[in-house]
Design a protein with these regions (language model features):
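Short, conserved beta-strand element in jelly-roll/cupin
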Residues: 59-75
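A generic fold-level signal
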Residues: 37-39, 60, 108
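Short acidic-glycine-tyrosine-enriched beta hairpin
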Residues: 79-99
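A short, N-terminal "cap"/entry segment at the start of jelly-roll beta-barrel domains
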Residues: 1-49, 54-55, 86-87, 132
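Tight coil/turn sites that cap or link beta-strands
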Residues: 48-52, 91-92, 98-100, 110
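Short beta-strand His + acidic residue motifs that chelate non-heme Fe in jelly-roll/DSBH
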Residues: 54-56, 75-76, 97, 102-108, ...
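Double-stranded beta-helix
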Residues: 3, 7, 104-132
Length: 132
């Protein structure tokens, strides 16, 4: 029987699962030890200028915190049928939203966002599209 690792050193962009940006969570194979988690998931989102999720979507199971590392990000929430836009424009700006928050987003300039989602529950995520 093997022993569980005490630590892991890696790179978020390299360690992402299925080219999604997500690198910690229940979707990481269990043999990856510490990166396989059911309480939290992490995403290193690298987005080109104009890249977007144009179709509003909600994760019905988890709370999400997205922290801007570089660039800018428009996040649009559907609040009772009315769009409400939040713009992350300064490094360290963040938005937190709960389960069921319908949202879409668009990168303004080349953008990097670290997203933390909890708990880590498998859901079908929409594909992103390039702006044009």
């Amino acid at each position: 029987m093997g022993s569980k690792a005490l630590f892991y050193f890696g790179n978020a962009a390299v360690d992402q699962v299925r080219n999604t940006g997500w690198f910690v969570g229940q979707f990481v194979p269990a043999e990856q030890d510490l990166r396989h988690q059911t309480d939290v998931e992490l995403k290193w989102g690298v987005h080109k200028d104009g890249e977007q999720r144009s179709h509003p979507w909600a994760n019905g199971n988890a709370t999400t915190i997205s922290v801007l590392i570089q660039g800018a990000l428009h996040v649009t929430f559907d609040v009772g049928g009315t769009p409400q836009v939040v713009t992350l424009r300064t490094e360290g700006d963040y938005v937190i939203f709960g389960p069921g928050a319908v949202h879409s987003w668009e990168a303004v300039g080349d953008t990097i966002v670290l997203s933390v989602r909890f708990p880590s529950v498998e859901v079908e995520r929409p594909r992103m599209s390039s702006g044009g």
